[in-house]
């Protein structure tokens, strides 16, 4: 036996050793103190596992869970049973999906022996329910009439992710840069006088007295509301009077509605009597500044709502009565902002798909129709592309219902009336706006369109005019109607005539300036001449029937100005024809009308000066023609409307040869100006429409010294009388086709006992002999 105690030649047996560490310390290779629970397990917070337990890590749990779900998913895929548990949606949602599939899903065709039975085929031209849902987008409706619209193509990162239970509204913008001097400076106007001016309650206390407020609201709806029906009068009057409530529980007014209220007061003040208001222009601008301040209070001023859109539209209308705002393109910026606000609240989508109330649906359609019309008329006047095309909106036309027939408690929109309502004029403008959009789209193309497109658009205008209801047509009973109805009837006629002039004006220029193309475009030449003549005399008839103040609508200015320019262009090109004297009388006529219309307003002063200069140039042309000079000798001296004139060249640039430059230099020298002062003279002295369209007018070549004999301080009278402005021999000559009239009518006209421009013009256009003779004088064959 050895010293170790083992027998020699035998293996030693292992003895049972004591536990040296717990299982967790052994797994982590930590030194264990062998006191249960050990110190390491106590520090790790697992004393209950010591000494025999082991901790499974979180990562191991996730991996095992993932593996188990993968196995379950593989089994479900291999299984043919559709009743397996879904891993993506819950069981309740799966039941809803199955129900929808049973109702709307495409089912396999049933077996039938009838071979003639056709199978349902999916038509790509007819979108499915899923396609329509993808196009609509989503509309969020909040408290106080706030809306937010997000299209289906919008990025989720652009949509504010807020608590759905929160009452906080989404905002659209932070600061309105409407014109260079931003409107937030309007707060400084009262900061030194009124403390806490940025509080809506303070601005509410600054409202005029209730009696004056009621008077201003009446003046607005009588003189401005007819031009754009964007305010529901009963609801607005009720809400406006609630601002004067002295109830202790009265809530703070919304800044958007305060801005709208102040703009109604602003436009109503422009039509007040001088006896009631000493300086109405100053007071109107004060209301305008308060409206801007309400609009800019905090970020709530740009929360998309109907009140904010209407307030901005009224600001654009007011800018045409303020010379300072008109120079800064304020209306253009306002309408652009209003369209963005309207699109942000989904006005370009018909509200019926969003299940809105009848009142909200009706007002949204009215406001959107008026906004589109305003934008497109502004595009015509400034020569800029419009904002929204017809293909980007699906809003239906408003219903022809009275304001008193619908309210916020109405369950449905009443049946449309067959008589005239407050919405009738808006419905007509909505129909006309669609055709005007096609005209503008053609006008702003970079490639010259075909003349067949112009003829097709002309037919659309004729169809629209023929489909006018009886209450929108000028008739013999028109003088007996209320003033607002008379203005609407004449305005419908004016709008169609102006759109026709805008459409055919480029072709009129080509027919007048190019002899080789005169035969091809004689229809446009004839149309522009006759329509402009009719428009001027219709404006005269309207001024004889209604007060002057409502006629200061900015659209009338553009209508009559364009017609006067076309008549002047004819007289400059063909001074030896019989119609040239009539064209000159029309130009003189429109100058006197503008002198009478401008009154105390500044918006027509520049147009009046421009027409006076043009009339002087036509008069000089007549003097040169009387001395034996032929029109061909003076063709290069005649400026024309080259804007949007189709050209065979790809870049349609106006000619600028050495003779024209020398002529301009001579004219500038006669005015006491140098060529370096050209840009300054154009920017300071030209009207806004000439600054925006340098190719549309050539005012420097038309510039003549002002006529000092004219009286700029013409009295303001309720209605207009031609005897106040013309002598008997100065009244305009109306071309009349005597061959198409009876003997008694001819005798009454030759005696010149009474002049009725409406009836005389209708008589002059009863036949085509007059215009045929005029074309023969110009050398145009039949």
UniProtKB/Swiss-Prot annotation:
Residues 105-126, 645-665 are annotated as: Disordered. It comes from the Eukaryota. One of its GO terms (cellular component) is nucleus. This is Uncharacterized transcriptional regulatory protein C1F7.11c. It is found in: Nucleus. Signal peptide: none annotated. InterPro entries: Sec_Metabolite_Reg, Transcription_factor_dom_fun, Zn2-C6_fun-type_DNA-bd_sf, Zn2Cys6_DnaBD. One of its GO terms (molecular function) is DNA-binding transcription factor activity, RNA polymerase II-specific. Residues 22-50 bind DNA. GO terms for biological process: DNA-templated transcription; regulation of transcription by RNA polymerase II. Keywords: DNA-binding, Metal-binding, Nucleus, Transcription, Transcription regulation, Zinc. It holds the Pfam family Fungal_trans. Residues 654-665 have a biased composition (Basic and acidic residues).
């Amino acid at each position: 036996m050895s010293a170790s105690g083992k027998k020699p030649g035998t293996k030693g047996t292992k003895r049972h050793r004591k536990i040296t560490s717990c299982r967790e310390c052994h797994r982590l290779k930590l030194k264990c103190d062998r006191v249960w629970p050990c110190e390491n397990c106590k520090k790790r917070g697992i004393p209950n596992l010591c000494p025999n337990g082991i901790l499974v890590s979180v990562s191991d749990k996730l991996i095992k869970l993932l593996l188990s779900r993968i196995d379950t998913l593989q089994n479900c895929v291999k299984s043919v049973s559709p009743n397996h548990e879904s891993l993506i949606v819950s069981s309740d949602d799966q039941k809803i999906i199955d129900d929808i599939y049973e109702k709307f899903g495409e089912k396999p065709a049933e077996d039938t022996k009838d071979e003639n039975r056709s199978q349902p085929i999916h038509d790509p031209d007819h979108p499915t329910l899923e396609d329509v849902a993808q196009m609509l987008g989503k509309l969020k409706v909040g408290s106080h009439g706030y809306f937010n619209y997000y299209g289906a193509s919008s990025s989720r990162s652009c949509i504010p992710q807020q608590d759905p239970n929160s009452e906080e509204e989404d905002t659209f913008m932070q600061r309105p840069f409407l014109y260079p001097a931003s409107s937030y400076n309007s707060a400084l106007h009262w900061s030194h006088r009124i403390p806490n001016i940025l509080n809506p309650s303070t601005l509410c206390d600054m409202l005029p007295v209730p009696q004056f407020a009621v008077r201003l609201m009446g003046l607005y709806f009588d003189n401005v509301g007819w031009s754009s029906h964007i305010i529901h009068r009963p609801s607005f009057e009720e809400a406006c009077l609630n601002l004067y409530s002295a109830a202790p529980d009265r809530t703070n007014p919304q800044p958007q509605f305060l801005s709208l209220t102040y703009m109604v007061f602003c436009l109503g003040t422009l039509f007040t009597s001088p006896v009631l208001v000493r300086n109405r222009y100053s007071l109107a601008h004060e209301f305008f500044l308060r409206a801007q301040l309400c609009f800019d209070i905090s970020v709530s001023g740009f929360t998309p709502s109907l009140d904010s859109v209407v307030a901005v539209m009224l600001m654009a209308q007011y800018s045409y009565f303020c010379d300072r705002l008109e120079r800064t393109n304020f209306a253009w910026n306002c309408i652009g902002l209003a369209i963005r606000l309207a699109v942000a609240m989904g006005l370009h989508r018909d509200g019926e798909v969003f299940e809105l109330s009848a009142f909200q649906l009706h007002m949204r359609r009215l406001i959107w129709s008026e906004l589109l019309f305003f934008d497109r008329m502004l595009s015509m006047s400034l020569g800029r592309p419009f904002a929204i095309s017809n293909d980007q909106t699906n809003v239906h036309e408003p219903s022809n219902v009275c304001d008193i027939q619908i309210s916020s408690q109405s369950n449905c929109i009443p049946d449309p009336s067959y008589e005239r309502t407050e919405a009738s004029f808006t419905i007509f403008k909505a129909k006309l706006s669609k055709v005007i959009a096609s005209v503008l789209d053609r006008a702003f193309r970079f490639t010259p369109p075909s003349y067949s497109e112009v003829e097709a658009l002309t037919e659309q205008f004729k169809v629209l005019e023929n489909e006018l209801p009886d209450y929108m047509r000028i008739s013999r009973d028109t003088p007996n109607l209320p003033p607002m109805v008379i203005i609407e009837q004449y305005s419908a006629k004016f709008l169609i005539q102006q759109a026709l002039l805008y459409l055919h004006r480029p072709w009129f220029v080509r027919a007048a300036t190019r002899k080789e193309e005169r035969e091809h475009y004689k229809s446009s030449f004839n149309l522009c001449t006759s329509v402009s003549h009719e428009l001027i005399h219709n404006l005269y008839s309207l001024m004889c029937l209604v007060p002057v103040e409502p006629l200061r609508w900015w659209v009338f200015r553009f209508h009559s100005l364009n017609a006067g320019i076309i008549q002047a262009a004819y007289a400059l090109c063909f001074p030896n024809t019989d119609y040239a004297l009539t064209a000159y009388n029309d130009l003189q006529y429109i100058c006197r009308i503008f002198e009478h219309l401008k009154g105390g307003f500044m918006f027509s002063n520049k147009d009046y000066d421009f027409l006076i200069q043009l009339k002087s140039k036509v008069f000089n042309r007549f003097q040169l023609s009387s001395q034996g000079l032929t029109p061909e000798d003076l063709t290069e001296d005649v400026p024309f409307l080259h804007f949007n004139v189709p050209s065979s060249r790809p870049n349609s640039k106006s000619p600028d040869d050495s003779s024209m430059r020398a002529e301009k230099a001579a004219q500038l020298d006669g005015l006491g100006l140098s060529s370096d002062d050209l840009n300054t003279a154009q920017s300071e002295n030209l009207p806004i429409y000439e600054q925006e369209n340098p190719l549309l007018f050539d005012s420097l070549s038309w510039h003549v010294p002002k006529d000092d004999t004219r009286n700029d301080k013409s009295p303001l009278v309720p209605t207009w009388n031609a005897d106040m402005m013309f002598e008997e021999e100065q009244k305009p000559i109306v071309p009349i086709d005597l061959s198409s009239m009876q003997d008694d009518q001819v005798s009454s006209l030759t005696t010149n006992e009474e002049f009725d421009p409406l009836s005389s013009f209708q008589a002059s256009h009863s036949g085509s002999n007059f215009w045929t003779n005029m074309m023969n004088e110009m050398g145009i064959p039949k």
